[in-house]
């Protein structure tokens, strides 16, 4: 992959570089994904998650930018694994962009085949929001992480993480949310990463409080704050596959254990035990097969230590990076003895059509986001948990790139919020249009048996029709851009998922599109969980009037 040193930053204000606000939104969000404040390795087009890219290569990136600048408001641009391949006449209510990233026929859906194609320049890894142009930095996963640790606190620690120690690893674009999510819930956390740059970045953005290279110092500080029942987050430089076994040897058991290293990609994501970053990069280049094997062996040790901690009383869960699957394939037969975070903590929210709803101010003006915060506090005042989140986010979350906000809203709530935002753009309360989107990790848009659809009540974990239906209904309902990806979060062969983005530009046409899309999108989550037999989803569907032909 050619590295290009150039600083990409989305335009701000109301001057258009394109032929309409929807095209402008796509252009600005693509560029925002590659803003140095947002992307992990912008010079390689890598946004987050190992090698999750915004475009296949620099030639494709430039062609996408040129295409968006000339795209008419009744045309649709097609993007295949980060490369623009066609512009067709469509209509004004159709998506302006349709994206398909990293999709492989199931028999060939593995890292080896993907890498062959990538080497030939035929494919890229889109992760979830990297290739679909709606990544907003670490805030994008923060509330989900906050909700996860909050639910763990409610289930196991009396509603707060005060006086508890969480141990985790991985401080990249996704995992970097963990330290702040734990301290927001009142806890102490030691978060391990092999890359000092990742820890430094989280400290700079106020997601993590302190840095140390000493396990002794990390434990001393953690114990001191745990006894005081005060929150603190400690970024510890090191390899989790070495540090966790060392803690086991010392008979030190945290209260909560999880992991968000990039274990989904054994070649580009995980660093084997005994290697510096530089040595790992050299081995990756010279002997990728040996690198992958060493990574898998390290992951197995990592999971073994997590299992031992679980046996000693730690609340242990997988945070969706497929590390259990790797360890299982390496012969660790009890790797799945600790649950994934979705069945353990998040599924009830999915049954209500709730998920990580986000919006971005295309103006670049933080005031536009603060005004939308007030809408949440006013319109959803009865939801104290949600309002607390907004208040904390305002104080503690630093914007990366274009100002943005995330919060988990459910069926009915998303459409209501979208309507209000569009009206605020129309009457000039907001200085420019707002982009509304979400993660692919949502209630009705993903099939991922080791993560979002793990342990479904009816055994339908691997059924992948749902994300396809989600993309189809969002497209016909007029989403601004729609994406279908493979392998996000957990790696090749383990997930299919869909994304959508809708632009609130203040027009009446946008109001109608918003109403349709922000109803059908979370509606798919309710439908999917009704179909799987969840009573809470059935109650939600009946209460909200979701039309499900065979619902009992």
UniProtKB/Swiss-Prot annotation:
> Is ATP-binding among the key words of this record?
no
Entries under SUPFAM superfamilies matching the protein: Urocanase
Q: Name one GO biological process term.
A: L-histidine catabolic process to glutamate and formamide
State any single GO MF term: urocanate hydratase activity
Against Gene3D superfamilies, the record matches this protein to:
Urocanase like domains, Urocanase superfamily
The EC category is lyase
Q: Where in the cell is it found?
A: Cytoplasm
User: What metabolic or biological pathway is this protein involved in?
Assistant: Amino-acid degradation; L-histidine degradation into L-glutamate; N-formimidoyl-L-glutamate from L-histidine: step 2/3
Which Pfam families does this UniProt record tie to the protein? Urocanase, Urocanase_C, Urocanase_N
HAMAP family of this UniProt entry?
A: HutU
Protein name as catalogued: Urocanate hydratase
